[in-house]
Regions:
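Conserved alpha/beta catalytic core and glycan-binding cleft of carbohydrate-active enzymes
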Residues: 1-92, 157-158
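Aromatic- and carboxylate-lined catalytic core of secreted/periplasmic carbohydrate-active enzymes
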Residues: 11, 99-132
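Hydrophobic, well-ordered secondary-structure elements that form the walls
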Residues: 70, 82, 115, 154-156, ...
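Residues that flank catalytic or metal-binding motifs in active/ligand-binding sites
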Residues: 95, 111, 138
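Solvent-exposed beta-hairpin/edge-strand motifs
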Residues: 167-176
Length: 205
């Protein structure tokens, strides 16, 4: 939380809104591989290495959360070709192989299209101010606002549930309404929320 606010306070808004938000580049291992289980092996072993189905499932869950932040934080989401298709690979040259035409992860591609549409539908996400509302214990909530639009981004990377204020949920993953109307984020859940009460307190406890 403090790191985000330090960036927001030390860069002009015009600059912050144009920074390139990368998860992967041609000079780094594929983000899906980074988010999988650690592997130390020879260059030949890394060339042949692919995640097990269980490892890949975990890495994909982490990537969905990371991409959600990539599209909701200030800056321009920049996607390295193939990351949206689920490509794996260690450092150069393994991160630069051909795009997997006809073998893409279509579910992941659809998710990236949905994130792009979500950002495109919200001026607050594209150009809004950033304010960190709560951070700690594996949880973070921040708002993006401009003009009359204000949205709250919440990510739960803790081991327990996180109860959030009631409101309109514009996007959610691993979330459910409570009997009293609040939004409950499960472990690994995240959402884009418009709280019914703009002054509602968000606790990380």
């Amino acid at each position: 939380g403090e790191s985000l606010m330090t960036l927001a306070e030390n860069y002009p808004p015009e600059v912050l809104s144009c920074v390139m938000n990368h998860l992967g580049t041609h000079d780094t291992p594929r983000i899906l591989t980074v988010l999988g289980e650690p592997f130390r092996g020879t260059k030949d072993e890394r060339a042949r290495r692919r995640m097990t189905p269980v490892q890949r499932k975990t890495a994909l869950m982490r990537l969905r959360m990371a991409a959600f932040l990539q599209f909701t934080l200030p800056g321009m989401p920049c996607i390295y070709y193939g990351d949206e298709a689920g490509m794996e690979g260690f450092e150069d040259p393994f991160c630069r192989v051909c795009y997997p035409w006809g073998h893409e992860d279509e579910e992941l591609r659809a998710y990236y299209r949905m994130m792009s549409a979500l950002r495109g539908s919200s001026e607050a996400l594209r150009r809004g101010d950033l304010r960190v509302l709560a951070a700690g214990n594996g949880r973070i909530a921040f708002s993006r606002s401009i003009g009359g639009e204000r949205v709250v981004v919440c990510v739960n990377h803790s081991i327990g549930e996180w109860v959030l204020p009631a409101g309109r949920v514009r996007f959610a993953e691993s979330a459910a309404p409570s009997p009293t109307g609040e939004v409950v984020l499960m472990r690994g859940g995240f959402c884009l929320l418009e709280p019914s009460d703009p002054e509602a307190h968000i606790s990380i406890e």
